[in-house]
Swiss-Prot record:
Keywords: Acyltransferase, Amino-acid biosynthesis, Cytoplasm, Diaminopimelate biosynthesis, Lysine biosynthesis, Repeat, Transferase. Its EC number is 2.3.1.117. Pathway: Amino-acid biosynthesis; L-lysine biosynthesis via DAP pathway; LL-2,6-diaminopimelate from (S)-tetrahydrodipicolinate (succinylase route): step 1/3. The keyword Cell wall biogenesis/degradation does not apply. It catalyses: (S)-2,3,4,5-tetrahydrodipicolinate + succinyl-CoA + H2O = (S)-2-succinylamino-6-oxoheptanedioate + CoA. Homotrimer. It comes from Colwellia psychrerythraea (strain 34H / ATCC BAA-681). The gene is dapD. This is 2,3,4,5-tetrahydropyridine-2,6-dicarboxylate N-succinyltransferase.
Length: 279
């Protein structure tokens, strides 16, 4: 069993000396520590962020391990079905057999790109999309066509990422937290959730909603404005809020209602959003 505390210690020290590290100069201890950290990310035994006592905790040393990996790997030719590629990070499913896919319990559709160092849980369907290093996609998710799960992004159980969705990645600055989509969320087509925003459990994001840290998230029922966090059970659509002078308006994400898990399961996403548009 990998000693994560020891790995963290080696990675932290190596990161302070990263300017002097290259494929030619890296020590076997540092190289093995980085590879072990990536293996832990790859199999899900470690993750960049995890919920502890109701709050998200970021394991910064794992982000540092990912950054160090770019210093210890040379670019190399990667063979693909339709083309040849040249990159530092190998593909997660390179060399996988049918038995290995069946053991993992995942479906990976041709055209999907999943990098080593990311975790894909059981019963996940990965359509032609991109999952970056350090990302964690929990069980039962749909990663639909042309969606992007950025570096170190955390996707909870039973999340639906619709076509063209962008979930932002973060490696630097180190103090920045990853973008997090909690369990049982729905992210509508072409929406973008970035810059470490947290979408809490059971939220429904309509098509074409863009949320970063500076985006106003306005609750029309309470008048409250949130930043960087979509409250649990929120149904969110794109909208605008007027300026103080009343001469212009600026984009905002609008919370039009709240739903619980029971209502969400009973009504369904399409009916819920259709009802919102008719209000």
């Amino acid at each position: 069993m990998t000693d994560l505390k020891h790995l963290a210690s080696v990675i932290e020290q190596a990161f302070e000396e990263r300017a002097s590290i290259s494929p030619a100069t890296v020590s076997s201890e540092i190289k093995n520590a980085v590879l072990d950290a990536l293996a832990a990310l790859n199999n899900g035994s470690a993750r960049v962020a995890e919920k502890v006592d109701g709050s998200w905790h970021v394991n910064q040393w794992l982000k540092k391990a990912v950054l160090l990996s770019f210093r210890i790997w040379d670019n190399q030719v990667i063979d693909g079905a339709e083309s040849t590629f040249f990159d530092k990070v190998p593909m997660k499913y390179e060399g996988y057999t049918q038995a290995m896919f069946e053991a993992d319990g995942v479906r990976v559709v041709p055209g999907a790109s999943v990098r080593t160092g990311s975790f894909i849980g059981k019963n996940v369907v990965v359509m032609p999309s991109f999952v970056n290093i350090g990302a964690f996609v929990d069980e039962g998710c749909m990663v639909d066509a042309w969606a992007t799960v950025g570096s170190c992004a955390q996707i909870g159980k039973n999340v639906h990422l619709s076509g063209g969705v962008g979930i932002g990645g973060v490696l630097e600055p180190l103090q920045a937290g990853p973008t997090i989509i909690e369990d049982n969320c729905f992210i509508g087509a072409r929406s973008e959730i970035v810059e470490g925003v947290i979408v809490e459990e059971g939220a429904v994001i309509s098509m074409g909603v863009y949320i970063g840290q500076s985006t106003r998230i306005f609750d029309r029922e309470t008048g409250e404005v949130h930043y960087g966090r979509v409250p649990a059970g929120s149904v969110v659509v794109p909208g605008n809020l007027p300026s103080a002078c009343g001469t212009y308006s600026l984009y905002a994400a609008i919370i039009v209602k709240k739903v619980d898990a029971k209502t969400l399961a009973k009504v369904g996403i399409n009916e819920l959003l259709r009802a919102v548009s008719e209000e």
